[in-house]
Structure formats: C-alpha cells, structure tokens
Amino acid sequence: MSVLFISDLHLEAERPDITRAFLSFLDERARRAEALYILGDFFEAWIGDDGMDAFQHSIASALRQVADGGTRLYLMHGNRDFLIGQAFCREAGCTLLPDPSVIDLYGEPVLLMHGDSLCTRDEAYMRLRRWLRNPLTLWVLRHLPLATRHKLARKLRKESRAQTRMKAVDIIDVTPDEVPLAMRRHGVRTLIHGHTHRPAEHALEVDGQPARRIVLGDWDRQGWALEIDANGHRQAPFPL
C-alpha cells in the first residue's frame, strides 16, 4: 500500500470541478491507500468549526467514509484554513497535525510543512502570519460573530490576491536558506510541503549529505498528488 500527499485544493462551493475531482480521488485512490496527508489550504477559507456550512459538512462526510474504510487521514493547517479545529476533524475522522511535523515514512524521518513559514522574504506576510497565529488572536477570532468572521475572511482573501499580484516571484516563494535550516533542525533529509503552487522536486545538501524538497501542486487547472510506497515516489497531475 502507498501513502498519498496533497495540498492547496482551496475547496469551495464555487468550484464544483475541484470538488468533483477530489471526491473521485477519494473513491479511486485514497480508499486504497494506507494514509492520506492533506498539507494545508484544504479549504479556500475557514471561519471556524461553528460556522461550517452544508458544503463543508459534505466534505467531512466524504472523508469520514474513507477513514471508516481503514485509510488514516491527516490534516495540517494552511494559511487559508488555520481555524479548522477538532470538531471538524472528529466529524471527518482525521487527525490534525501541527506544522511542522516529522513522520516515519518507510523507515525514513520526513518533515511535513504547509510551507508558508519558509517564505521569510515576504516580510509583510510573515508579520501577518505571526499575528494571526498568536493564541490570543485565535481566541478572539473564534469568538467573533459569524457575520464578522465572514466579512474578515473575504477582506483578507481580497487583500492577499492583490498583494500576491504585486509582489516579485522570488519574494512569495520559499527562501532557499530556510530549507536546510528547517531540515537540520528536525534531523531529516526529505521535506514535503505545499503553499507555493509550484510542484517540483529540488535536490540540495544538508550538512554535506544529499537531501530533497518535494513541493506539492495546487488544484486549480488540474489536480496533483504525491504517492510514496516502499519502492519510491511519484508526483503527477490529473484532470479536474
């Protein structure tokens, strides 16, 4: 059996093509896998488990069916859905992973991240990230009225899109020097992350030893999945 990794689906009711592709992916591939790891930005936005709508409940139900079939499900926060909590995870049958996390993958320690924390050259975003992830900020956000949270989420998404268009490509990508630092800190030679929407595999050295960074693809014009088993790994796109 294999282990699957996906990220950056940005699921929302307004993109039924992505939803259909994801449900097919669950039926055709995830049910046969040992585990599925979703490394952030699973949803386009998340205002809190208490604000789940019918669409989000339907996604949780689909995940639960896969979990009940024996596939282990793991979910990591992204920059769009960091308010996902234990209520959703219980409903979906998945385990919420901290970012970063180290897992044992066929005898090798592997570092998993969403990836946004590696983009340190984007100083404005890093300041916003630190503020949003502050425990006090999280508490306040979760206790705001739902209508206020919806309004704030729309505002943040609009500003994020505008700023991304204005920033240089290298600013919003991973800072190269941060990668070996993170890998050395966690004692790994393999890092898997998403966030940048630039699927690729990068070779590097950490303390003189060969290492690799696998970047997951986003689900916009096509879907992406990384599949790893005891014999190797393969990341490939597929149509929505």
From Swiss-Prot:
Recite the UniProt keywords alphabetically.
Answer: Cell inner membrane, Cell membrane, Hydrolase, Lipid A biosynthesis, Lipid biosynthesis, Lipid metabolism, Manganese, Membrane, Metal-binding
Asked whether the UniProt record includes Cell inner membrane among its keywords, one would answer yes
One GO biological process term is: lipid A biosynthetic process
Where mainly found? Answer: membrane
Output a single Gene Ontology CC term carried by this record.
Answer: cytoplasm
**Sites where the protein binds Mn(2+) 2:** 41, 79, 114, 195
Q: Name one GO molecular function term.
A: UDP-2,3-diacylglucosamine hydrolase activity
For binding Mn(2+) 1, which residues are annotated in this chain's numbering?
Answer: 8, 10, 41, 197
What job does the chain carry out? Answer: Hydrolyzes the pyrophosphate bond of UDP-2,3-diacylglucosamine to yield 2,3-diacylglucosamine 1-phosphate (lipid X) and UMP by catalyzing the attack of water at the alpha-P atom. Involved in the biosynthesis of lipid A, a phosphorylated glycolipid that anchors the lipopolysaccharide to the outer membrane of the cell.
HAMAP family cross-referenced by the UniProt entry: LpxH
What PANTHER family has UniProt attached to this entry? Answer: UDP-2,3-DIACYLGLUCOSAMINE HYDROLASE (PTHR34990:SF1), UDP-2,3-DIACYLGLUCOSAMINE HYDROLASE-RELATED (PTHR34990)
Please state which protein family the record places this protein in: Belongs to the LpxH family.
Q: What is this protein called?
A: UDP-2,3-diacylglucosamine hydrolase
Organism of this sequence = Pseudomonas paraeruginosa (strain DSM 24068 / PA7) (Pseudomonas aeruginosa (strain PA7))
**Source gene?**
lpxH
